[in-house]
């Protein structure tokens, strides 16, 4: 569903000659995402949460409010006299995100808060970036082109950590 929504927004933006879309996700959304991914036993990619910036469907996407709480953003919008639209599905208990939101309230006394989960996602995103950099450097030294294909010495590949192999 998320991919379909992004594709629809991208189609609309391209018809309007818009190249950049800003999304209103907040630290609360990030924490909910991390919690949902934790429930799925996600690896590093899932636990980094939502990306802040990326390019897809010919559009540059950004989430500049990932550092702000949902209520902080709403307070700012109120002070500016700006309205927003809440998706009614955000109150539907059938959806995992709504369940995660409610679970976060229950986990808060344990110190598992929006702020801590968002900070953890940020730390893991930095770790993912470091891993990507290391893999890129390793690929530069190990990968050779042969007969139009790319090869890596099998024995060397087998001795790499699984995250490096992926």
Segments from the language model and where they lie:
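Flexible helical/loop "lid" subdomain adjacent to adenine-nucleotide binding pockets
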Residues: 20, 26, 31-166
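Glycine-rich phosphate-binding loop signature in dinucleotide/nucleotide-binding domains
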Residues: 12-19
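ATP-dependent adenylate-handling ligase core
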Residues: 1-11, 44
């Amino acid at each position: 569903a998320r991919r379909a929504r992004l594709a629809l927004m991208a189609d609309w933006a391209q018809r309007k000659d818009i190249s950049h879309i800003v999304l209103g996700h907040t630290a609360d959304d990030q924490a909910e995402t991390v919690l949902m991914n934790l429930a799925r036993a996600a690896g590093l990619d899932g636990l980094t949460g939502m990306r802040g910036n990326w390019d897809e469907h010919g559009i540059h996407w950004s989430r500049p409010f990932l550092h702000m709480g949902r209520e902080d953003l709403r307070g700012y919008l109120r002070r500016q006299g700006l309205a927003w639209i809440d998706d009614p599905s955000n109150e539907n208990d059938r959806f995992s995100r709504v369940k995660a939101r409610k679970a976060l309230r229950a986990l808060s006394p344990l110190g598992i808060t929006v702020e801590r989960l968002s900070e953890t996602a940020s730390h893991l995103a930095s770790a993912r970036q470091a891993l990507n950099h290391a893999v890129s450097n390793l690929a530069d030294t190990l990968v050779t082109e042969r007969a139009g294909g790319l090869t890596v010495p099998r024995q060397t590949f087998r001795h790499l950590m699984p995250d490096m192999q992926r």
